Curated annotation (Swiss-Prot):
It comes from Bacillus subtilis (strain 168). It holds the Pfam family FliS. Homodimer. Interacts directly with flagellin (hag), forms a 3-way complex of Hag, FliS and FliW in which Flis and FliW do not directly interact. This is Flagellar secretion chaperone FliS. It is found in: Cytoplasm, Cytosol. The gene is fliS.
Length: 133
């Protein structure tokens, strides 16, 4: 029987025990990680690594878009923004454009920060203290 890497086991446990809000936060953080890795790959002229990381970021943006609750009015605006970010990531991949990546990184950071604040507010309301997400 193979021994599992403790870090991998910890990550898996974090995903398995996370709330839906925490999972969304993990997706935003993962997207930011892959965008940054893709930008580094462009700077290092590593097109294979750039492509791999941008595809991962694109997949995360698609997942975030697919999981929107379409019964909420704000979802239409968020969906349009996710579509725009996805298209910009595709264009950045084709054109090797770090400026486009920086643009999308800014949007994802804004979404992530707002989401993190919402999680903290919800925890504070529920538990009477502001836990860190």
């Amino acid at each position: 029987m193979a021994i599992q890497n403790p870090y991998t086991a910890y990550q898996q446990n974090s995903v398995n025990t996370a709330t839906p809000g925490e999972l969304t936060l993990m997706l935003y953080n993962g997207c930011l990680k892959f965008i940054r890795l893709a930008a580094q790959a462009i700077e290092n002229d590593d097109m294979e690594r750039k492509n791999e990381n941008l595809i991962k970021a694109q997949n995360i943006i698609q997942e975030l878009n697919f999981t929107l609750n379409r019964n909420i009015e704000l979802s239409a605006s968020m969906g349009a923004m996710y579509d725009y970010m996805y298209r910009r990531l595709v264009q950045a991949n084709i054109k090797n454009d770090t400026g486009m990546l920086a643009e999308v990184e800014g949007y994802v950071t804004d979404f992530r920060d707002a989401w993190k604040q919402a999680i903290q507010s919800e925890r504070k309301d529920r538990h009477g203290s502001g836990g860190i997400a």
